[in-house]
A protein has these predicted regions:
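Active-site cofactor/cluster-binding pocket
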Residues: 1-202
Length: 202
């Protein structure tokens, strides 16, 4: 994929690793020589609060803000949040969505009604939606914290640089934690990439 500027919107719930994933994506873009701008634009990053970040990179980027209808990819760590931000995608762009539900406190407080079928609603709106259960993949690998690496694997083939560049940034991020942690993240990345490839609509 090649864009003058690549616009990625990442959304989810605090504690899922949304900000860490955005940081790693930005590190990969910088490693490839791109000008990078990113910002957290909504919610609070503490566990349970909604988190949304905008990431833009290219030859020269003036603003970190993504305008509605201009995102090239949406990386949704939580299905209802992905639905809520789907209007930011440009026509024909892809949403990669973890379909495991994590209901935020605003729902429990009655401030927001959780949609019955957020993935189905996205598809009915014509959004090119690729969904998979990142939480189960991470759990099967032995650690739910691997979920953000699973999500990074899922987006790897939608970036204007190779998956190996992104994986290298993940390895560098976790290298200080030891080879076992690095290897678990390698497996999570590969599993997420495979899950997304298998779920891409024809």
């Amino acid at each position: 994929m090649t864009f003058e500027t690549t616009n990625i919107l990442v959304c989810g719930i605090g504690g899922q690793g949304v900000m860490t994933a955005t940081e790693i994506l930005s590190e990969a873009a910088i490693a490839e020589g791109h000008d990078v701008k990113k910002t957290e634009v909504a919610g609070m990053s503490q566990r349970g609060g909604v988190v949304t970040s905008h990431l833009r990179f290219g030859r020269k980027v003036l603003s970190p803000q993504i305008a509605p209808g201009t995102a090239d990819v949406l990386l949704g760590f939580e299905a209802a949040e992905a639905l809520r931000w789907a209007h930011y995608l440009k026509p024909g762009a892809m949403a990669l969505v973890n379909d495991a539900r994590l209901v935020p406190p605003v729902v429990e407080l009655g401030l927001f009604k959780y949609p019955d079928d957020p993935i189905g609603e996205m598809k009915s709106r014509g959004v090119r939606t690729v969904s998979f259960d990142a939480a189960t993949i991470a759990r099967d690998l032995g650690d739910l914290r691997l979920g953000n690496t699973v999500m990074l694997g899922a987006i790897a083939d939608q970036l204007p640089f190779s998956a190996e560049v992104l994986l290298d940034c993940i390895v560098k991020r976790f290298a200080r934690k030891g080879e076992q942690v690095v290897e678990m993240n390698r497996k999570a990345f590969a599993a997420g990439r495979e899950a997304a490839q298998a779920a891409v609509p024809a």
